[in-house]
Amino acid sequence: VGSEMCIRDRVYEESQPFVLGLTTGRTPLGLYRELVKRHHEGQISFRNVAVYSLDEFYPIRSTERQSRNYRIHEEFLNHIDILPENVHIPDGTVPEDRVSEYCASYDHSVRRIDLMIIGVGEDGQIGFNEPGSYSRSRTRLVQLTYNTRKIQSGAFFGLENTPKMAVTMGIDTIMRANRIILMAWGEEKAHIVQRVVEGEITDQVPASYLQAHQNIEVVIDENAA
């Protein structure tokens, strides 16, 4: 990933940054730490990189420790030289009567993603595209399933405090990326990885839609294989 950004940085003009789609959670932490390490060693600069984050809880303030905004800054963005104006993260504080308009605007701003980094959930979701998500879905406000909220509830100190909704890039938005890296670690992901990679394409396993992408790499550890 770092090498790819360095190569593109040499051929892109400043008006055309390398556009990186990012996710949060445990899955990409190792990658982010490696990119930060390479940055501190002088191997990579992020000044010609723009990032678009995949999703955010709703409603939530960016200063709350459980927010995607807070986490991606703490885990990655605060440790590199990316320009603040090149950071794009869904806003979890948009008034409810403006959410649809905001989501359409965010989706429109994601005109080009050079590389999308994503993980896969235990139910086959990507971002907050839960089972049942439409293949042509765009950035939108979604209802979180009970299972997703239960998984997230530890961070929110109880299910009753866990948001019931989220803003997420849609399947179609993700599929527009020029290249996708899908990552999964651990034995608990082995079953869903098999369905994503070898199973039928179905809305019940949203990540299975990625089989139709022309330039995707699946990176897993031995336990998830």
Where are these regions (language model features)?
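Short, small-residue-biased leader/transition segments that mark boundaries at the very start
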Residues: 1-7
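Short beta-strand segments
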Residues: 21-25, 53, 90, 117-120, ...
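Ligand-binding beta-strand-loop-alpha-helix segment within the catalytic cores
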Residues: 44-117
